[in-house]
Amino acid sequence: MHKVAIFGGSFDPVHKSHIQIAKLAFKSLDLKKMIFVIAYTPPHKTKQYAYIEDRISMLKLATGNMQKTEISLYEAQKLETVYSYQTLDYFNSLYPEDEIYMVIGSDSLLDLPIWNNIDYMAGRYKFIVAKRHGFDEVNKNVKYLDRCVFIDKETEDISSTEIRRLVKEDYKKAVSMLNKKVYNYIIQNGLYK
């Protein structure tokens, strides 16, 4: 049975930590494929800053040289909130012979119990958990730990929120957090001003 990872997010913008997580997941789990799923409107967010077309373009630039990856517009084309279990069910229907994983950050572990339909989701799928800076060892009482595979290496402490703030204040400060092509795209298209 092969492993297919679903990496969902708003990618507003996609940054170096997103790509680092994807590469570490490939290395740790010998994945068949990583599918980046761009959310139209994530359930936990109220606003997007860049148009969906710009977020797709930036993700294509960031993943352009990565093998065994694809970008899915499954959620984006719905034009509404799509819950994680629905996305995983969709990809499970496309890859019924494979094991489906969802990529999350370790900071999301504590929130899992409040995710929509989480018991169903955790019963069918597994999570690839990327360590986030500042998130100490996972509390052993966290629910669903047995459904998690942890990436041992901590990823860079980068957030899309911080990048948007830096671009607005002084775009040169954001350059180290972004793929060079993504950075150039943001500047050339006047995003996050």
From Swiss-Prot:
Pathway: Cofactor biosynthesis; NAD(+) biosynthesis; deamido-NAD(+) from nicotinate D-ribonucleotide: step 1/1
Signal peptide: none
Catalysed transformations (reactions): nicotinate beta-D-ribonucleotide + ATP + H(+) = deamido-NAD(+) + diphosphate
Broadest EC class assigned to this enzyme: transferase
The keyword S-adenosyl-L-methionine belongs to this UniProt entry's keyword annotation: no
SUPFAM superfamilies: Nucleotidylyl transferase
Sorted UniProt keywords: ATP-binding, NAD, Nucleotide-binding, Nucleotidyltransferase, Pyridine nucleotide biosynthesis, Transferase
InterPro entries: Cyt_trans-like, NadD/NMNAT, Rossmann-like_a/b/a_fold
One Pfam family hit: CTP_transf_like
Keyword Transferase: yes
Gene Ontology MF: a single term: ATP binding
Family: Belongs to the NadD family.
Protein name: Probable nicotinate-nucleotide adenylyltransferase
Organism, as annotated: Endomicrobium trichonymphae
GN (gene name): nadD
